[in-house]
Protein backbone atom coordinates (compact mmCIF):
# COMPACT_ATOMS: atom_id res chain seq x y z
CA UNK A 1 0.00 0.00 0.00
CA UNK A 2 2.80 2.40 0.87
CA UNK A 3 4.56 1.84 -2.45
CA UNK A 4 1.32 2.50 -4.32
CA UNK A 5 0.77 5.74 -2.43
CA UNK A 6 4.36 6.79 -3.10
CA UNK A 7 3.98 6.07 -6.82
CA UNK A 8 0.81 8.14 -6.81
CA UNK A 9 2.62 10.91 -4.95
CA UNK A 10 5.50 10.96 -7.43
CA UNK A 11 3.02 11.02 -10.29
CA UNK A 12 1.31 14.07 -8.80
CA UNK A 13 4.66 15.78 -8.28
CA UNK A 14 5.57 15.18 -11.92
CA UNK A 15 2.33 16.84 -13.03
CA UNK A 16 3.22 19.89 -10.95
CA UNK A 17 6.67 20.32 -12.52
CA UNK A 18 5.73 23.17 -14.84
CA UNK A 19 3.90 25.04 -12.11
CA UNK A 20 6.74 24.64 -9.63
CA UNK A 21 9.39 25.63 -12.17
CA UNK A 22 7.55 28.87 -12.83
CA UNK A 23 7.01 29.52 -9.14
CA UNK A 24 10.63 28.91 -8.20
CA UNK A 25 12.03 30.89 -11.14
CA UNK A 26 9.93 33.93 -10.33
CA UNK A 27 10.46 33.55 -6.61
CA UNK A 28 14.21 34.24 -7.00
CA UNK A 29 13.58 37.71 -8.36
CA UNK A 30 10.91 38.39 -5.77
CA UNK A 31 13.12 37.41 -2.86
CA UNK A 32 15.89 39.68 -4.10
CA UNK A 33 13.41 42.56 -4.10
CA UNK A 34 12.08 41.63 -0.68
CA UNK A 35 15.17 40.22 1.01
CA UNK A 36 14.99 42.72 3.85
CA UNK A 37 11.31 42.10 4.63
CA UNK A 38 11.91 39.81 7.57
CA UNK A 39 14.12 42.34 9.36
CA UNK A 40 11.47 45.04 8.86
CA UNK A 41 8.31 43.01 9.47
CA UNK A 42 6.97 45.51 11.96
CA UNK A 43 7.32 48.46 9.57
CA UNK A 44 5.52 49.39 6.39
CA UNK A 45 7.47 47.95 3.50
CA UNK A 46 7.59 49.38 0.00
CA UNK A 47 10.04 47.65 -2.33
CA UNK A 48 9.38 47.94 -6.04
CA UNK A 49 5.74 48.70 -5.25
CA UNK A 50 5.15 45.65 -3.02
CA UNK A 51 3.38 46.51 0.23
CA UNK A 52 2.67 44.21 3.14
CA UNK A 53 -0.71 44.65 4.81
CA UNK A 54 -0.47 46.74 7.96
CA UNK A 55 -2.27 44.01 9.90
CA UNK A 56 0.06 41.28 8.66
CA UNK A 57 1.74 39.16 11.34
CA UNK A 58 5.41 38.32 11.08
CA UNK A 59 6.11 34.87 9.69
CA UNK A 60 5.09 32.62 12.56
CA UNK A 61 8.30 30.59 12.54
CA UNK A 62 10.82 33.10 11.23
CA UNK A 63 11.13 31.65 7.73
CA UNK A 64 13.18 33.92 5.45
CA UNK A 65 13.45 34.08 1.66
CA UNK A 66 16.43 32.30 0.16
CA UNK A 67 17.84 35.62 -1.01
CA UNK A 68 18.63 36.47 2.61
CA UNK A 69 20.98 33.48 2.78
CA UNK A 70 22.90 34.80 -0.22
CA UNK A 71 23.33 38.10 1.61
CA UNK A 72 24.47 36.40 4.83
CA UNK A 73 27.43 34.28 3.76
CA UNK A 74 28.30 33.32 7.33
CA UNK A 75 24.96 31.60 7.80
CA UNK A 76 23.99 28.02 7.01
CA UNK A 77 20.47 26.97 6.13
CA UNK A 78 18.95 25.11 9.08
CA UNK A 79 16.38 23.82 6.61
CA UNK A 80 19.02 21.51 5.11
CA UNK A 81 20.82 20.48 8.29
CA UNK A 82 17.53 19.65 10.02
CA UNK A 83 16.19 17.47 7.20
CA UNK A 84 19.25 15.23 7.01
CA UNK A 85 19.25 13.06 3.90
CA UNK A 86 15.84 14.44 2.94
CA UNK A 87 17.29 17.89 2.30
CA UNK A 88 17.63 17.10 -1.42
CA UNK A 89 13.84 16.95 -1.76
CA UNK A 90 11.97 20.07 -2.78
CA UNK A 91 9.94 21.82 -0.12
CA UNK A 92 6.73 20.89 -1.89
CA UNK A 93 7.65 17.22 -2.01
CA UNK A 94 8.51 17.25 1.70
CA UNK A 95 5.09 18.76 2.42
CA UNK A 96 3.35 16.27 0.13
CA UNK A 97 4.95 13.41 2.09
CA UNK A 98 3.97 15.00 5.41
CA UNK A 99 0.43 15.22 4.09
CA UNK A 100 0.17 11.45 4.51
CA UNK A 101 0.64 11.76 8.30
CA UNK A 102 -1.99 12.17 10.98
CA UNK A 103 -1.90 14.88 13.63
CA UNK A 104 -0.10 12.75 16.23
CA UNK A 105 2.66 11.82 13.79
CA UNK A 106 3.09 15.46 12.80
CA UNK A 107 3.37 16.41 16.45
CA UNK A 108 6.02 13.78 17.12
CA UNK A 109 7.98 14.67 13.99
CA UNK A 110 8.01 18.33 15.03
CA UNK A 111 10.33 17.39 17.91
CA UNK A 112 12.98 15.82 15.67
CA UNK A 113 14.63 19.04 14.48
CA UNK A 114 14.04 22.73 13.91
CA UNK A 115 13.51 22.05 10.23
CA UNK A 116 10.85 19.42 10.82
CA UNK A 117 9.26 21.75 13.36
CA UNK A 118 8.79 24.39 10.66
CA UNK A 119 7.53 21.97 8.03
CA UNK A 120 5.10 20.14 10.32
CA UNK A 121 3.58 23.46 11.39
CA UNK A 122 2.86 24.51 7.80
CA UNK A 123 -0.74 25.70 7.96
CA UNK A 124 -2.09 23.92 4.84
CA UNK A 125 -1.24 20.56 6.46
CA UNK A 126 -3.49 21.41 9.39
CA UNK A 127 -6.13 22.92 7.15
CA UNK A 128 -6.39 19.56 5.36
CA UNK A 129 -6.63 17.73 8.70
CA UNK A 130 -9.43 20.03 9.85
CA UNK A 131 -11.42 19.70 6.64
CA UNK A 132 -10.91 15.93 6.40
CA UNK A 133 -11.60 15.08 10.04
CA UNK A 134 -13.90 17.82 11.31
CA UNK A 135 -15.64 18.48 8.00
CA UNK A 136 -17.54 21.73 8.51
CA UNK A 137 -18.12 21.32 12.24
CA UNK A 138 -15.49 23.64 13.65
CA UNK A 139 -14.97 27.16 14.91
CA UNK A 140 -11.87 28.79 13.49
CA UNK A 141 -9.35 29.77 16.20
CA UNK A 142 -6.97 32.04 14.34
CA UNK A 143 -4.92 29.26 12.75
CA UNK A 144 -5.71 25.83 11.37
CA UNK A 145 -3.48 24.06 13.89
CA UNK A 146 -5.13 25.86 16.81
CA UNK A 147 -8.52 25.02 15.32
CA UNK A 148 -7.65 21.33 15.14
CA UNK A 149 -6.17 21.19 18.64
CA UNK A 150 -9.09 23.13 20.13
CA UNK A 151 -11.62 20.73 18.62
CA UNK A 152 -9.79 17.44 19.19
CA UNK A 153 -7.76 18.14 22.34
CA UNK A 154 -9.58 20.88 24.28
CA UNK A 155 -7.41 20.48 27.37
CA UNK A 156 -4.30 21.38 25.33
CA UNK A 157 -5.88 24.37 23.60
CA UNK A 158 -4.03 27.23 25.32
CA UNK A 159 -0.81 25.23 25.58
CA UNK A 160 -0.79 24.60 21.84
CA UNK A 161 -1.36 28.25 21.04
CA UNK A 162 1.64 29.26 23.18
CA UNK A 163 3.87 26.69 21.49
CA UNK A 164 2.63 27.50 17.99
CA UNK A 165 4.92 30.47 17.40
CA UNK A 166 8.52 29.39 18.11
CA UNK A 167 10.83 31.19 15.70
CA UNK A 168 13.66 29.28 14.05
CA UNK A 169 16.86 31.10 13.17
CA UNK A 170 18.55 30.77 9.79
CA UNK A 171 15.71 28.91 8.06
CA UNK A 172 15.54 29.92 4.40
CA UNK A 173 12.86 28.75 2.00
CA UNK A 174 11.41 30.55 -1.00
CA UNK A 175 8.45 28.18 -1.12
CA UNK A 176 7.37 28.66 2.50
CA UNK A 177 8.16 32.37 2.52
CA UNK A 178 6.17 33.02 -0.64
CA UNK A 179 3.17 31.26 0.87
CA UNK A 180 3.29 33.79 3.74
CA UNK A 181 3.96 36.65 1.34
CA UNK A 182 0.98 35.87 -0.89
CA UNK A 183 -1.27 35.74 2.17
CA UNK A 184 -0.19 39.18 3.37
CA UNK A 185 0.55 41.20 0.23
CA UNK A 186 -1.55 44.22 -0.64
CA UNK A 187 -2.93 44.47 -4.17
CA UNK A 188 -0.66 46.88 -6.05
CA UNK A 189 -2.49 49.97 -7.37
CA UNK A 190 -1.30 49.22 -10.89
CA UNK A 191 -3.08 45.87 -10.75
CA UNK A 192 -6.36 47.75 -10.36
CA UNK A 193 -5.82 50.68 -12.71
CA UNK A 194 -6.66 49.11 -16.06
CA UNK A 195 -10.40 49.21 -16.79
CA UNK A 196 -11.08 48.53 -20.45
CA UNK A 197 -14.39 46.68 -20.31
CA UNK A 198 -17.34 48.12 -22.21
CA UNK A 199 -19.90 49.51 -19.77
CA UNK A 200 -23.58 49.87 -20.65
CA UNK A 201 -26.65 51.13 -18.84
CA UNK A 202 -30.25 50.79 -19.98
CA UNK A 203 -29.60 49.03 -23.28
CA UNK A 204 -32.32 46.85 -24.79
CA UNK A 205 -32.19 43.07 -24.91
CA UNK A 206 -31.83 43.30 -28.68
CA UNK A 207 -28.78 45.56 -28.34
CA UNK A 208 -27.22 43.19 -25.82
CA UNK A 209 -27.72 40.17 -28.07
CA UNK A 210 -26.50 41.96 -31.21
CA UNK A 211 -23.45 43.68 -29.73
CA UNK A 212 -22.29 41.29 -27.00
CA UNK A 213 -23.96 37.88 -26.79
CA UNK A 214 -23.75 36.94 -30.48
CA UNK A 215 -20.19 38.26 -31.03
CA UNK A 216 -19.20 36.67 -27.69
CA UNK A 217 -17.83 39.84 -26.07
CA UNK A 218 -17.79 40.75 -22.35
CA UNK A 219 -19.77 43.72 -21.07
CA UNK A 220 -20.41 45.26 -17.68
CA UNK A 221 -24.08 46.15 -17.17
CA UNK A 222 -25.16 48.89 -14.80
CA UNK A 223 -28.57 49.43 -13.25
CA UNK A 224 -30.13 46.10 -14.21
CA UNK A 225 -30.49 44.74 -10.66
CA UNK A 226 -31.57 47.95 -8.93
CA UNK A 227 -34.93 46.37 -8.06
CA UNK A 228 -33.45 43.34 -6.32
CA UNK A 229 -34.40 42.87 -2.68
CA UNK A 230 -30.98 41.25 -2.31
CA UNK A 231 -29.26 44.50 -3.28
CA UNK A 232 -31.17 46.35 -0.56
CA UNK A 233 -31.08 43.73 2.18
CA UNK A 234 -28.13 41.39 1.88
CA UNK A 235 -25.46 42.36 4.33
CA UNK A 236 -23.81 40.23 6.97
CA UNK A 237 -26.26 41.06 9.77
CA UNK A 238 -29.29 40.33 7.61
CA UNK A 239 -27.94 37.02 6.35
CA UNK A 240 -26.90 35.85 9.81
CA UNK A 241 -30.37 36.62 11.17
CA UNK A 242 -32.03 34.89 8.25
CA UNK A 243 -29.85 31.81 7.89
CA UNK A 244 -26.89 31.95 10.28
CA UNK A 245 -27.43 28.31 11.31
CA UNK A 246 -27.93 27.02 7.78
CA UNK A 247 -25.05 25.04 6.28
CA UNK A 248 -23.67 26.15 2.93
CA UNK A 249 -20.99 24.68 0.67
CA UNK A 250 -17.54 26.02 1.54
CA UNK A 251 -14.79 24.35 -0.43
CA UNK A 252 -15.02 20.59 0.23
CA UNK A 253 -17.24 20.91 3.32
CA UNK A 254 -20.47 22.50 4.52
CA UNK A 255 -20.37 25.17 7.22
CA UNK A 256 -22.96 27.17 9.09
CA UNK A 257 -23.00 30.68 7.69
CA UNK A 258 -22.32 32.25 11.09
CA UNK A 259 -19.28 30.03 11.63
CA UNK A 260 -18.02 30.79 8.13
CA UNK A 261 -18.09 34.51 8.90
CA UNK A 262 -16.13 33.72 12.07
CA UNK A 263 -13.50 32.09 9.86
CA UNK A 264 -13.44 34.84 7.24
CA UNK A 265 -12.96 37.53 9.91
CA UNK A 266 -9.72 35.94 11.12
CA UNK A 267 -8.25 34.14 8.13
CA UNK A 268 -4.89 35.16 6.73
CA UNK A 269 -3.88 32.54 4.19
CA UNK A 270 -2.79 32.21 0.59
CA UNK A 271 -6.04 30.66 -0.63
CA UNK A 272 -8.95 31.60 1.64
CA UNK A 273 -11.96 29.33 1.56
CA UNK A 274 -15.02 30.98 0.09
CA UNK A 275 -18.69 30.08 0.21
CA UNK A 276 -19.95 28.82 -3.16
CA UNK A 277 -23.34 27.13 -2.87
CA UNK A 278 -25.54 25.92 -5.77
CA UNK A 279 -28.55 25.08 -3.57
CA UNK A 280 -28.89 28.34 -1.66
CA UNK A 281 -32.41 29.05 -2.95
CA UNK A 282 -33.58 25.55 -2.01
CA UNK A 283 -32.02 25.79 1.45
CA UNK A 284 -33.37 29.28 2.13
CA UNK A 285 -36.28 30.05 -0.24
CA UNK A 286 -36.32 33.72 0.77
CA UNK A 287 -32.86 34.11 -0.75
CA UNK A 288 -34.25 32.90 -4.05
CA UNK A 289 -37.19 35.29 -3.77
CA UNK A 290 -34.96 38.34 -3.37
CA UNK A 291 -33.35 38.21 -6.80
CA UNK A 292 -34.42 37.53 -10.37
CA UNK A 293 -32.52 36.77 -13.55
CA UNK A 294 -31.71 40.06 -15.31
CA UNK A 295 -33.75 40.55 -18.46
CA UNK A 296 -30.72 40.02 -20.72
CA UNK A 297 -30.18 36.41 -19.65
CA UNK A 298 -33.68 34.93 -19.53
CA UNK A 299 -33.41 32.95 -22.75
CA UNK A 300 -31.75 29.86 -21.30
CA UNK A 301 -31.80 26.59 -23.22
CA UNK A 302 -30.68 24.73 -20.08
CA UNK A 303 -34.24 25.14 -18.83
CA UNK A 304 -35.48 22.33 -21.09
CA UNK A 305 -33.55 19.84 -18.94
CA UNK A 306 -35.82 20.43 -15.96
CA UNK A 307 -34.67 18.48 -12.91
CA UNK A 308 -31.80 16.97 -14.91
CA UNK A 309 -30.18 20.36 -15.30
CA UNK A 310 -26.66 20.50 -13.79
CA UNK A 311 -25.87 23.07 -11.10
CA UNK A 312 -26.23 26.47 -12.71
CA UNK A 313 -26.56 29.18 -10.03
CA UNK A 314 -24.55 29.96 -6.93
CA UNK A 315 -24.38 32.42 -4.08
CA UNK A 316 -20.78 33.47 -3.50
CA UNK A 317 -19.44 34.96 -0.25
CA UNK A 318 -15.79 35.49 0.59
CA UNK A 319 -13.24 37.74 2.28
CA UNK A 320 -10.70 39.95 0.55
CA UNK A 321 -8.22 37.78 -1.34
CA UNK A 322 -10.63 34.93 -2.03
CA UNK A 323 -11.81 34.16 -5.53
CA UNK A 324 -11.28 31.90 -8.53
CA UNK A 325 -8.08 31.38 -10.49
CA UNK A 326 -8.15 31.18 -14.28
CA UNK A 327 -10.72 28.78 -15.68
CA UNK A 328 -13.28 28.40 -18.47
CA UNK A 329 -16.88 27.73 -17.47
CA UNK A 330 -18.05 24.16 -18.23
CA UNK A 331 -20.48 22.84 -20.82
CA UNK A 332 -19.87 25.75 -23.23
CA UNK A 333 -21.94 28.01 -20.99
CA UNK A 334 -21.87 31.77 -20.69
CA UNK A 335 -22.32 33.37 -17.29
CA UNK A 336 -23.40 36.51 -15.51
CA UNK A 337 -22.13 37.60 -12.11
CA UNK A 338 -23.95 40.23 -10.03
CA UNK A 339 -22.15 41.88 -7.12
CA UNK A 340 -24.47 42.59 -4.20
CA UNK A 341 -21.91 43.77 -1.65
CA UNK A 342 -18.21 44.55 -2.00
CA UNK A 343 -16.13 44.64 -5.19
CA UNK A 344 -14.29 42.20 -7.45
CA UNK A 345 -11.35 42.51 -9.81
CA UNK A 346 -11.92 40.65 -13.10
CA UNK A 347 -9.42 39.65 -15.78
CA UNK A 348 -10.70 37.94 -18.94
CA UNK A 349 -8.87 36.47 -21.95
CA UNK A 350 -10.64 35.42 -25.18
CA UNK A 351 -10.90 31.71 -26.00
CA UNK A 352 -7.90 31.76 -28.36
CA UNK A 353 -5.53 33.31 -25.79
CA UNK A 354 -4.24 31.19 -22.90
CA UNK A 355 -3.33 33.42 -19.93
CA UNK A 356 0.37 33.58 -18.98
CA UNK A 357 1.32 31.07 -16.30
CA UNK A 358 -1.66 28.85 -17.14
CA UNK A 359 -1.07 25.41 -18.67
CA UNK A 360 -4.20 23.47 -19.67
CA UNK A 361 -3.93 19.79 -20.53
CA UNK A 362 -4.53 18.86 -24.20
CA UNK A 363 -8.14 17.91 -23.50
CA UNK A 364 -8.69 20.92 -21.23
CA UNK A 365 -9.75 18.72 -18.31
CA UNK A 366 -6.87 19.83 -16.07
CA UNK A 367 -5.27 23.23 -15.66
CA UNK A 368 -1.87 23.86 -14.02
CA UNK A 369 -1.59 27.41 -12.71
CA UNK A 370 0.01 29.34 -9.83
CA UNK A 371 -0.97 28.22 -6.34
CA UNK A 372 -2.79 31.45 -5.54
CA UNK A 373 -4.33 34.40 -7.35
CA UNK A 374 -1.91 36.86 -5.75
CA UNK A 375 1.00 34.74 -6.97
CA UNK A 376 -0.32 35.07 -10.53
CA UNK A 377 -0.46 38.86 -10.16
CA UNK A 378 3.07 38.96 -8.73
CA UNK A 379 4.64 36.81 -11.41
CA UNK A 380 2.58 37.18 -14.58
CA UNK A 381 0.32 40.22 -14.58
CA UNK A 382 3.05 42.60 -15.74
CA UNK A 383 3.75 40.57 -18.87
CA UNK A 384 0.23 41.16 -20.20
CA UNK A 385 1.03 44.83 -20.80
CA UNK A 386 3.14 43.87 -23.81
CA UNK A 387 0.71 41.37 -25.30
CA UNK A 388 -0.90 42.21 -28.63
CA UNK A 389 -4.20 40.81 -27.37
CA UNK A 390 -4.55 42.41 -23.96
CA UNK A 391 -7.03 41.03 -21.43
CA UNK A 392 -10.34 42.67 -20.61
CA UNK A 393 -10.17 44.06 -17.07
CA UNK A 394 -12.48 45.81 -14.67
CA UNK A 395 -13.51 46.21 -11.05
CA UNK A 396 -17.14 45.17 -10.66
CA UNK A 397 -18.86 46.94 -7.77
CA UNK A 398 -22.11 46.46 -5.89
CA UNK A 399 -25.11 46.78 -8.20
CA UNK A 400 -23.13 45.91 -11.33
CA UNK A 401 -23.31 42.75 -13.45
CA UNK A 402 -20.59 41.36 -15.68
CA UNK A 403 -21.33 39.13 -18.68
CA UNK A 404 -18.72 36.37 -19.20
CA UNK A 405 -19.07 34.92 -22.71
CA UNK A 406 -18.69 31.24 -23.48
CA UNK A 407 -15.11 29.97 -23.70
CA UNK A 408 -13.46 33.03 -22.12
CA UNK A 409 -10.73 32.46 -19.54
CA UNK A 410 -11.42 34.48 -16.42
CA UNK A 411 -9.92 35.18 -13.01
CA UNK A 412 -11.71 37.01 -10.20
CA UNK A 413 -10.50 38.16 -6.79
CA UNK A 414 -12.46 39.85 -4.02
CA UNK A 415 -10.99 43.23 -3.10
CA UNK A 416 -13.04 43.28 0.11
CA UNK A 417 -15.62 41.04 1.72
CA UNK A 418 -18.07 40.43 -1.09
CA UNK A 419 -21.45 38.85 -1.72
CA UNK A 420 -22.55 37.92 -5.24
CA UNK A 421 -24.86 35.73 -7.28
CA UNK A 422 -23.69 34.06 -10.46
CA UNK A 423 -25.50 31.92 -13.00
CA UNK A 424 -24.44 29.88 -16.03
CA UNK A 425 -26.72 29.65 -19.03
CA UNK A 426 -26.90 28.61 -22.69
CA UNK A 427 -28.62 30.75 -25.30
State where each predicted segment sits.
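N-terminal accessory scaffold of Fe(II)-dependent oxygenases
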Residues: 2-401, 409-427
